[in-house]
Amino acid sequence: MVLLFSCTKDDTISVVPTIEFKSITPSIAQEYIDDINIIISYTDADGDLGENNPDVYNLFVLDNRNGIEYKFRIPELTPNGNEIAIEGNFNIKINGSGITNSSTSQQVNYDIYVTDRGGNVSNTVSTSYITIEEE
């Protein structure tokens, strides 16, 4: 699930989307029980971030333990395809992650990037580490 907030006009930002890691919670997650919540901020000068086609994914989260990529869809953020600068936050939820080795706890972090309708790929940000523990 992805939630978003705020749009503003600013001519000093790039048409290539830019993202910034804000937070990841909880710091310790129970395996298969606790959801992992990540917040990133975004800016995009021409407002073409997001897509209304339900078959197009444009937000990607890579689990650095095993290379599994979670794919999300950001809905179109500007009304009627207007070219306006936008900025805000995305809340990303990863449901109940598991331990991928034979230990009783494991650290994990994620790499995240977005793409826009113009084919521009944002910078990639890395989250801080959290620990997943057996229940």
Q: Residues of each region from the PLM?
A:
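C-terminal motif of bacterial Sec signal peptides marking the signal peptidase cleavage site
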Residues: L3-S6
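Bacterial signal peptide processing site
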Residues: T8-D11
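First exposed extracellular module after export/assembly in secreted or surface-exposed proteins
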Residues: V15-E135
